[in-house]
């Protein structure tokens, strides 16, 4: 069975009050249209066609290369939109039509829709739900056997039909051959002058084909996002789902209301997440980690047993059983090994720091390779920029960099090299050598008294 998705994403979304197309607004770090694409793939869809219109190039930039694009230059209704993808619909396909602004649809729901459609040998199946207040929605009218008779829009419903609580979700499953034939018979003979996809069900039924409705979803899951208020609601629901999913899988989240975890983040079991944490992008957190209050980690990998304390980590890697923070900043391309300590107010950028090394306080380590078991004292600066170019420094295994020292790149400190406190190092340091690069202390006895006398005389 070849499942293919057609995603309707051509609309402008004027109620969003945005210069950007509606479907690329993000929910928990991912564009709405990409949520739909990912969920459809997980449900078994092999190929995806996205119908674009308004600001098509902007949307296309956010889509993976394998996504098929079909254009709807004029927005003439949902049926017209699907017509634009007709060349990609094969007779043997099972087609699911989805809306690009419904990011909360679940993989399990689509799988059940497919199963229901196939088991009942329907040519078209609409996904439905029942609500307490159906006002504004298209009503599902079933025949005596429970099959779909028709879909009646709110404005066309009579008083009896308005009492029906089962509503149309806007998500459909079709037999490919039947859909192609029905699209050819669509017309726009209605008050809006549009081609409605819902009319395909009636066309199929009039031809004697079996069509159905699957009441297998919830109004929350089917919520469309048309405004910033609805975007916020979708974000809240998605965030709750994500947090609950991690907790079910063995992660402790102290305060779910203040914890923000994006949809592609992965976390190992027995990790504890404290309040105020933000985990974004493709971040991977290992098992038995502690992610402390107000830490922000983006597109980074954290090894098992590591503790992050109130720190910011971006596009970096931290090994196992290491500690970072409090108030540390790992900028892009920081790569820390196992059992590494990066302490308070230490900044690391584009640097490798190997196993067992530590920089406990107030240091800047940029464009560097630090070996194993190196001690970097308080106030050490890797001076990497001459105003035009950046250079790299290398500190090899078991070296000791004394407090308040400057390593002026490019410079190499060989194994067991020892830098005296307060030194400014501009030349390589040999293996096992002590480097002292500072003025010798001078004591001038009685200097203060002489200075005071001179100051008094000048008054």
From Swiss-Prot:
Q: Which SUPFAM superfamilies match?
A: Nucleotide-diphospho-sugar transferases, Trimeric LpxA-like enzymes
Q: Which InterPro entries does the annotation name?
A: Bifunctional_GlmU, GlmU-like, GlmU_C_LbH, Hexapep, NTP_transferase_dom, Nucleotide-diphossugar_trans, Trimer_LpxA-like_sf
Region named Linker: 229-249
Which Enzyme Commission numbers does its entry carry? 2.7.7.23, 2.3.1.157
The subunit field of the Swiss-Prot or TrEMBL record says: Homotrimer.
Kindly list the positions annotated as binding acetyl-CoA. 384-385, 403, 421, 438
**Could you give a single Gene Ontology term from the biological process aspect?**
regulation of cell shape
UniProt record similarity statement: In the N-terminal section; belongs to the N-acetylglucosamine-1-phosphate uridyltransferase family. In the C-terminal section; belongs to the transferase hexapeptide repeat family.
What function does the entry list? Catalyzes the last two sequential reactions in the de novo biosynthetic pathway for UDP-N-acetylglucosamine (UDP-GlcNAc). The C-terminal domain catalyzes the transfer of acetyl group from acetyl coenzyme A to glucosamine-1-phosphate (GlcN-1-P) to produce N-acetylglucosamine-1-phosphate (GlcNAc-1-P), which is converted into UDP-GlcNAc by the transfer of uridine 5-monophosphate (from uridine 5-triphosphate), a reaction catalyzed by the N-terminal domain.
Instruction: Please give the catalytic activity noted in the UniProt record.
Output: alpha-D-glucosamine 1-phosphate + acetyl-CoA = N-acetyl-alpha-D-glucosamine 1-phosphate + CoA + H(+); N-acetyl-alpha-D-glucosamine 1-phosphate + UTP + H(+) = UDP-N-acetyl-alpha-D-glucosamine + diphosphate
Catalytic residues as annotated in Swiss-Prot or TrEMBL: 361
Protein name, please? Bifunctional protein GlmU
Q: Give the binding site residues for Mg(2+).
A: 101, 226
The region called Pyrophosphorylase is annotated at 1-228
Co-factor remark: Binds 1 Mg(2+) ion per subunit.
Could you list this entry's UniProt keywords, alphabetically sorted. Acyltransferase, Cell shape, Cell wall biogenesis/degradation, Cytoplasm, Magnesium, Metal-binding, Multifunctional enzyme, Nucleotidyltransferase, Peptidoglycan synthesis, Repeat, Transferase
What this protein needs as a cofactor is: Mg(2+)
N-acetyltransferase, as annotated region: 250-459
Q: Which organism is it from?
A: Clostridioides difficile (strain 630)
